[in-house]
A protein has these predicted regions:
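Accessory, non-ATPase domains that flank or precede helicase/AAA+ motor cores in DNA-metabolism machines
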Residues: 1-286, 290-292, 296-297
Length: 297
C-alpha cells in the first residue's frame, strides 16, 4: 500500500533494495474497515431561468432557489435546505427540467475548526538568529543533506527561526516537516504557523479521530498541504519534494515508540532527510548526548 500511494520513485527503488537485501522485513496485517473520504451533496446551476416566467408577488421555492444559485452557481445541498423551507420537491423538478444537476464534492474534516487565525507578520531576527537562518537558507538553496543542532532555552526564539526557515523552503517550492513532542503540540504553536502559512499547514497527532487524520494525510499526499506539524508518527507523512525537517525538543523521550513497530522518530527523521537531500534542524534547550556527540565529531 505504501508503494502505491508514495509519489517518490526513488523511495520505491530504495525500499525494494532493502527488501532484496533482507534489511527490512515485509509483514501482512489484517486491518478493519478503512476510513473513507467524506462527501457532501452539491447543486450546480446549468440553465438560468427567465424571471418573467413568474408573475406571482410571492416568491416560489423555485424562484428562491434560482436566486441562491445566481449568487453561487454551485452550492451545498444543506445550505439550500437552511435557506429554503422543504426544497426537495422543487429541486427534483428543476433537475428534471435540466436547470440544475446534483453532484458530490469531497470535504475535509479538520481537527481545528473555524477560520484561519489572523495573519501575523514575521518578526525581525536578532543577529544570532539571523546567523543561524543564513546557514539554513544556504543549505536549502543548495538542496543537499545537512543536519544542524540549534541549542537555546525556552523563549530564546528558536520557533521564530523555524518559521523563517519554513518560509524560505516554501519559497523554493519545498515541503516542510515539523516534529514536536505530543505535549508541545498546542493550538498556540499550531496557530503560529497557520497565521503565516494558512491552509498549507496540516496537523497530524493522536488526539485526532480517524477521519480527521485520514483527511489531513490525504491533503498532504495530494499536495494541498506542504507543511506538516505533528508528533513522532508524522515522520511517515507522504510528502513531496521534502526540503526541510525540524525536530523541536529533539532530546524528548516521547520520540521513541515502545510498541511495535519500534522506532525513534528523531532518528527516522534524520535518515529521511538524508534520503531526500533535505536540511534537518534539531532544536533543544538540553540536547541529547547523541546529538551533542555528533556535533563534537
Amino acid at each position: 500500500e505504501w508503494l502505491q500511494c508514495n509519489p517518490d520513485k526513488r523511495d520505491h527503488q530504495q525500499l525494494r533494495n532493502w527488501l532484496s537485501k533482507d534489511q527490512v522485513q515485509s509483514t501482512q496485517v489484517l486491518i478493519g474497515q478503512k476510513t473513507k473520504p467524506k462527501m457532501e451533496r452539491w447543486i450546480r446551476l446549468l440553465k438560468p431561468d427567465n424571471p418573467n416566467n413568474y408573475v406571482s408577488r410571492r416568491k416560489t421555492k423555485k424562484q428562491q432557489i434560482f436566486e441562491i444559485l445566481n449568487e453561487n452557481s454551485e452550492i451545498c445541498w444543506s445550505e439550500v435546505q437552511n435557506r429554503v423551507n422543504a426544497p426537495s420537491q422543487a429541486l427534483k423538478k428543476l433537475k428534471e427540467d435540466g436547470h440544475i444537476e446534483f453532484f458530490e464534492k469531497r470535504v475535509y474534516r479538520r481537527f481545528m475548526e473555524g477560520g484561519l487565525p489572523e495573519i501575523e507578520p514575521f518578526k525581525e531576527l536578532t543577529p544570532e538568529q539571523k546567523s543561524v537562518f543564513e546557514k539554513l537558507s544556504d543549505s536549502l538553496k543548495n538542496g543537499t543533506y545537512r543536519t544542524y543542532l540549534l541549542e537555546g532555552i525556552t523563549g530564546s526564539g528558536k520557533t521564530e527561526v523555524y518559521l523563517h526557515a519554513v518560509r524560505e523552503a516554501h519559497k523554493l517550492g519545498k515541503s516542510c516537516l515539523i516534529l514536536v513532542p505530543e505535549i508541545s503540540l498546542t493550538p498556540q504553536l499550531v496557530n503560529r504557523f497557520r497565521s503565516r502559512f494558512g491552509d498549507h499547514v496540516a496537523i497530524l497527532h493522536s488526539g485526532m479521530d480517524d477521519g480527521e487524520r485520514f483527511d489531513e494525510w490525504s491533503r498532504v499526499r495530494h499536495g494541498f498541504a506542504s507543511i506538516v506539524i505533528g508528533a513522532r508518527s508524522a515522520v511517515f507523512s507522504p510528502m513531496k519534494n521534502l526540503g526541510l525537517i525540524v525536530i523541536d525538543e529533539e532530546h524528548d523521550p516521547s520520540y521513541k515508540q515502545g510498541e511495535t513497530p519500534r522506532y525513534h522518530g528523531r532518528d527516522v527523521a534524520i535518515f529521511r532527510g538524508y534520503e531526500a537531500g533535505a536540511t534537518v534542524l534539531l532544536g533543544s534547550a538540553t540536547p541529547s548526548l547523541e546529538s551533542s556527540n555528533n556535533v563534537s565529531n
